[in-house]
Design a protein with these regions (language model features):
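Fe-S-dependent hydro-lyases/dehydratases of central metabolism
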Residues: 1-233
């Protein structure tokens, strides 16, 4: 993906699935085509682990087949094989701590390949969130995006890069880590230079500074110093 193909906005292409604590409401959305109205006070399932998204036995698959088993491990047993894939859901909304547990990479991939564009939750676990970024699955903790998406608004991509370091933000704009690295290695995009001045460093920081990619085109390595918060390869 080149800079001309970077995502600048996103529009909802499917339905919104609320992973509600009410089994009847969840079932109606999954199998009866029901669409729930936006309600910021709705009780949603908390602590959905990546093990629930893709149970261990599902992880024998590693390709688009994972879409068929998205969320089949969710407590209560309401979500059956192909339910998410065949439901036409573009957004999945849940409660606290989405993506806790083992942080297995198959979890967000199953959502992406089931057609999900955006994951919205009250908070998102770090490694799960990074895995989403790396494959192009957008995430947000801003529930106010939901009515905007429902109205058909094209949401600026900046809504999904808030709080990210410069490299992570560019990964999101490019639609994932592979597309970003392709552009980086082609010289289409240049990561921000580490400008940290020489400073006392820990052993780990010294190793990172010595191995940091200073120039992707020439392969030159090494920067004078790094500090916590620096973004680099």
């Amino acid at each position: 993906m080149t800079t001309s193909q970077k995502r600048t906005s996103v529009q909802l292409k499917g339905r919104i699935l609320y992973l509600t604590e009410d089994p009847a409401q969840l079932k109606a959305q999954l199998y009866d085509g029901a669409s729930l109205p936006f309600d910021e006070h709705r009780k949603l399932v908390d602590n959905i682990s990546t093990d629930e998204l893709t149970p261990g036995w599902v992880c024998y698959y590693y390709d688009e087949t994972l879409a068929r088993y998205c969320l089949v491990g969710l407590r209560g047993g309401q979500i059956k094989q192909d339910a998410i894939k065949n439901g036409g859901f573009g957004v999945i909304v849940s409660g606290l701590s989405k993506g806790c547990g083992s942080s297995r990479e198959t979890a967000p991939y199953s959502e992406l390949k089931a057609g999900v564009q955006i994951v919205i939750a009250k908070n998102i676990e770090k490694i799960y969130g990074q895995n989403c970024q790396n494959i192009g699955l957008l995430t947000s903790t801003d529930v106010s995006l939901i009515p905007r998406l429902e109205s058909g608004e094209a949401i600026p991509i900046e809504e999904f890069t808030k709080g990210l370091d410069p490299i992570a933000a560019e990964v999101v704009r490019h639609g994932g880590l592979f597309a970003y690295n392709q552009a980086r290695l082609q010289g289409v995009i240049v990561p921000p230079m580490v400008t940290t001045a020489a400073r006392p460093m820990t052993l780990c920081e010294k190793i990172i500074a010595k191995s940091a990619i200073a120039d992707a085109k020439t392969g030159r390595l090494g920067v004078p110093a790094v500090k916590p918060g620096d973004a680099l390869f």
